[in-house]
Curated annotation (Swiss-Prot):
This is Homeobox-leucine zipper protein HOX4. It holds the Pfam family HALZ. Residues 1-35, 154-180, 250-277 are annotated as: Disordered. GO terms for cellular component: nucleus. Expressed in leaf and floral organ primordia, floral meristems, embryonic axis and cells surrounding the vascular bundles. Expressed in the vasculature of roots, stem, leaves and spikelets, and in the vascular bundle of the scutellum in embryos. Gene3D superfamilies: Homeodomain-like. Its main location: nucleus.
């Protein structure tokens, strides 16, 4: 089989050449990749072998002003701009596409910068609030510890005061005061003095009952004993006489309450009066 003459003649088909040139120039697709190469250069779409053509400064300024007014490109507006600037409608469309891509990129950059600044501010505020929170928590913990210490001290003081109150002086009915102590001491002294008095009166009692005094008594004790013997003996005889007269009466009451014979009261004091006279 013979190949077609057009394929072996060394000249490619116009459609293939145009696609290759389009892919080489980077304008086959609209995107972020071609925005740097098409900022001020446009490719003529009429012939497959035509080269790039740089836009003039006036054309770029006119396109910028039109883009600032409206970034959307309609067919009537595209044809009018191409006619006014001496460009192809395809050139105007590609320039607007690339310009919108750059505008969106810059807009995203501005939004990102604003959001980044807001994030940094919020992060600083968050850190400050966290530090304040930690400080407040530490202060609350310290206050709770201090309050617990005060409550423990108060409870300890109350518990300490209760035994102190129970250990206080007892009531008057159950305890002893200074007067009671002195009374007890006086009783002890009196109890100590009682045997001495008993010992001193023992010879007298013995003399009164007719018993001889102790062998160890002195001369003074013997004289006092004899004097006391005479005194008690005289009184004892007088009492015996009165008692005999009181009990010898024949009446039931012994004549003590009789109207006819009152008791001779003058006889009680007759002897001392006669002695004094």
């Amino acid at each position: 089989m013979k190949r077609p003459g057009g394929a072996g003649g060394g000249g490619g088909s116009p459609s293939l050449v145009t696609m290759a040139n389009s892919s080489d120039d980077g304008y086959g697709g609209v995107g972020m990749e071609a925005e740097g190469d098409v900022e001020e250069e446009m490719m003529a779409c009429g012939g497959g072998g035509e080269k790039k053509r740089r836009l003039s400064v006036e054309q770029v300024r006119a396109l910028e002003r039109s883009f600032e007014v409206e970034n959307k490109l309609e067919p009537e507006r595209k044809a009018r701009l191409a006619r006014d600037l001496g460009l192809q409608p395809r050139q105007v469309a590609v320039w607007f596409q690339n310009r919108r891509a750059r505008w969106k990129t810059k807009q995203l950059e501005r939004d990102y910068a604003a959001l980044r600044h807001s994030y940094d501010s919020l992060r600083l505020d968050h850190d400050a609030l966290r530090r304040d929170k930690d400080a407040l928590l530490a202060e609350i913990k310290e206050l709770k510890a201090k309050l617990g210490d005060e409550e423990a001290a108060a409870s300890f003081t109350s518990v300490k005061e209760e035994p102190a109150a129970s250990d206080g002086p007892p009531a008057a009915g159950f305890g002893s005061s200074d007067s009671d102590s002195s009374a007890v001491l006086n009783d002890v002294d009196a109890a100590g003095a009682a045997p001495a008095a008993t010992d001193a009166l023992a010879p007298e009692a013995c003399t009164f009952l007719g018993a001889p005094p102790a062998a160890g008594a002195g001369a003074g004790a013997a004289a006092a004993a004899s004097h006391e013997e005479v005194f008690f003996h005289g009184n004892f005889l007088k009492v015996e006489e009165d008692e005999t007269g009181f009990l010898d009466d024949d009446e039931p009451c012994g004549g003590f309450f009789a109207d006819d014979q009152p008791p001779p009261l003058s006889s009680w004091w007759a002897e001392p009066t006669e002695h004094w006279n």
